[in-house]
Amino acid sequence: MKQVIKAPLITEKNTYHNAAGVYVFEVDLKSSKTEVKAAVEKNFKVKVDSVRTSVCRGHSKQTKFGLTKVAYWKKAYVKLAEGEKIALFEGV
């Protein structure tokens, strides 16, 4: 069984989405929208209204050891039903 949700993405830009009931997570690259919806509903015990996903391209990064690759990754914008909140994001 794969772990669908890897980490919450808490950035200044994403905190503006929280006011509208949209929360952003880094998810497994091969997970689908229905898998993300089920994982959020199960882990945080909330009702999910919709899920939008975005695949972020990998790129090359210069380090002191030379050029390395940053892998592709996927993020999911999860919109909750009216009145629902995730406590993990509150107070950030």
Curated annotation (Swiss-Prot):
InterPro entries: Nucleotide-bd_a/b_plait_sf, Ribosomal_uL23-like, Ribosomal_uL23/eL15/eS24_sf, Ribosomal_uL23_CS
Source species, domain of life: Bacteria
GO terms classed as biological process: translation
Keyword Ion transport assigned: no
One example GO MF annotation: rRNA binding
A single cellular component GO annotation: ribonucleoprotein complex
Protein family (similarity comment): Belongs to the universal ribosomal protein uL23 family.
UniProt function note: One of the early assembly proteins it binds 23S rRNA. One of the proteins that surrounds the polypeptide exit tunnel on the outside of the ribosome. Forms the main docking site for trigger factor binding to the ribosome.
Subunit structure: Part of the 50S ribosomal subunit. Contacts protein L29, and trigger factor when it is bound to the ribosome.
UniProt-recorded name of the protein: Large ribosomal subunit protein uL23
Protein's organism: Bdellovibrio bacteriovorus (strain ATCC 15356 / DSM 50701 / NCIMB 9529 / HD100)
Gene responsible for this protein: rplW
